[in-house]
Amino acid sequence: MMQNNNELTRISIAILFITIFIATVNCSLLNFASSANAETAQQIQAKIDQKNLDIQNLEKVIKGYQIQIDDLGSQADSLSSTIKSLQLTQKKLEANISVTKDKITTKTFEIEQLGSQIDTKENNIGDDQRVIAQSFKQLNQMGNTDITQIIFGSHSVSGALNTLEELSVMQKNIFDKISSLNKDKDQLEVNKSASEKAKSDLLSLNKQLADQRKVVLSTVSQQDSLLKQTNESETSYKKLLAQKKAEQAAFQAEINNFESQLHMLMDPLKLPSAGSSVLVWPLSSVKITQYFGNTDFSNANPQIYNGKGHTGLDFRASIGTPVIAALSGTIIGSSNTDLVRGCYSYGQWLMIKHANGLSTLYGHLSLRSVSVGDKIATGQIIGYSGNTGYSTGPHLHFGVYASDGVQIKKFDTSINCKGATIPVADFKAYLNPLMYLPKQ
């Protein structure tokens, strides 16, 4: 009877080994099938690598355009240099569009690649689960065999030891399968998260592409408008600049008069402490062209600044440069003073109210990609830099305010800018942005 039990045990062990062997062969066949598709995976990776190389080459071209634009910006302001700068800007923007298209293609390939990896992992998990379930079933069937029956039912001590060793090996194989299963599950979650992020990035890139195309059209329109206004005459261009300066000064005088009468209650304790670096830079590459307060430029133009100095920071930023939110918050203001004929101020602008008592302003944009009421994340693209409003060249005006001391006002009775909407503030509400930005 013991001999029969021993034979049954050996048969069960053999069946279990065969089960694991067949499952292993199936996995090998699956891996072989995967290797048959590996060429496709390699081709996808090769395409990704090629697109990344294309992007690097285009970025070199863009850098070359930017150097030429910066050189023109350092020259005396003239119609010819302005037109040439706009033409170079258009070429740069079109190159930016090509980069974004390549990024979209690359991201699409990455999503395809991750999808294939997810399918493979799910198949592996299913196979491992079936092997483990079958193995446990076989072990349960063997569970009724007492170990003494295995030992004393064997023809020899070595036979009994071999049987026990076979059981030990089986147990290890099952544990290995469980470990492999857990690793596959972990990697599956990683791949799924990466796939979701890639899909989110793809949506952002498609929106960015649409925005960049709008900026190109805006640049072409700006160039055509300038040529019509000046009739391609340098003298007419100089007169136009002088007219803009005079009209901007007149509107600024109205603003200064209004703001001087504002006496809003502000609690300094509600504001972040200076040096806290609660904001991030609104551009990926930072070059400050005018600081906060009484700068050389503001002192040289008292008719514009009225002795209160420059109310923010100016950053060098060619037309179409992505502008990002310095901190999460809500868009509380958005307008375009250029829509009011003869009104030269911030041009296209946005204001974000943050939860820490601060509000930030982004002026002279070429395009706004968010709307009033939108919830914004730190670092999110909210628009693109430009040369709108009263601007001596493409740049970003960045202002920081105490939220309790600033309001959005529509100038319904303005002499110079009737209907224009801009932020106005108690003089004490204007804050130096460098108090809250990281050190360069």
Residue ranges of model-derived segments:
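Non-transmembrane, heptad-repeat alpha-helical coiled-coil rod segments
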Residues: 67-70, 74-89, 171-239
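Extracytoplasmic/periplasmic cell wall- or extracellular glycan-interacting regions that localize
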Residues: 228, 232-354, 358-363, 367-369, ...
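N-terminal secretory signal peptides that target proteins for export/translocation
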Residues: 1-9
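Heptad-repeat coiled-coil alpha-helices that serve as dimer/oligomer scaffolding interfaces
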Residues: 95, 99-116, 120, 215-260, ...
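Sec-dependent N-terminal signal peptides of Gram-positive bacterial secreted proteins and lipoproteins
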Residues: 8-34
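Active-site-proximal beta-strands of protease catalytic cores
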Residues: 329, 372-389
